[in-house]
Swiss-Prot record:
NCBIfam families: PRK13818.1, rbfA. Monomer. Binds 30S ribosomal subunits, but not 50S ribosomal subunits or 70S ribosomes. GO terms for biological process: maturation of SSU-rRNA. The keyword Cytoplasm applies. This is Ribosome-binding factor A. Disulfide bonds: none annotated. It comes from Lactobacillus helveticus (strain DPC 4571). The lineage of its organism: Bacteria, Bacillati, Bacillota, Bacilli, Lactobacillales. Its main location: cytoplasm. One of its GO terms (cellular component) is cytosol.
Length: 121
C-alpha cells in the first residue's frame, strides 16, 4: 500500500507542476515551486509543499491566497489526469527547507570569508 501512495504522490507532484506552469495564470503564483506532496493513507488529503525565493511576508500571504483560490481548478485538472477513484483534497503549506538551506549557505560563506581574513593577517 505504501508503494502505491508513493507513486500517487509522485504523480500529483508532476501534474501539479505542469498545471501551475501551463494552466494557472495568476501572477501571484509565478515564483512558486512545488517541492513535495504527502498523501494520507486513504488518499483523501494531499499536503502540497511549496517554496518561494522571497522572504517578504506580504508576498507569502498573497501566494497562499492565490493557491487557495486556484485550489478548485487544480483539483479539477488533477482529476482529469490521475487514475484514482477520488482526487485528494489539496492542502498547501510553505516549505521552509529551501529558505533554511540558503541561510546555511550564507553562514558558510561568511565563515569562509572570516577565515580568509584571519589567514591574510
Amino acid at each position: 500500500m505504501k508503494h502505491r501512495i508513493g507513486r500517487v504522490e509522485g504523480e500529483i507532484l508532476r501534474e501539479l507542476t505542469k498545471i501551475l506552469q501551463k494552466n494557472i495564470r495568476d501572477p501571484r503564483l509565478s515564483e512558486v515551486t512545488i517541492t513535495a506532496v504527502e498523501c494520507m493513507n486513504d488518499l483523501s488529503y494531499a499536503t502540497v509543499y511549496y517554496s518561494l525565493l522571497t522572504e517578504d511576508a506580504n508576498k507569502e500571504k498573497e501566494v497562499q491566497e492565490g493557491l487557495e483560490k486556484a485550489k478548485g481548478m487544480m483539483r479539477h485538472l488533477l482529476g482529469q489526469t490521475l487514475t484514482v477513484y477520488k482526487v485528494p483534497e489539496l492542502i498547501f503549506k510553505r516549505d521552509n527547507s529551501v529558505k533554511y538551506g540558503s541561510k546555511i549557505d550564507r553562514l558558510i560563506a561568511e565563515v569562509k570569508k572570516q577565515d580568509a581574513e584571519r589567514a591574510s593577517k
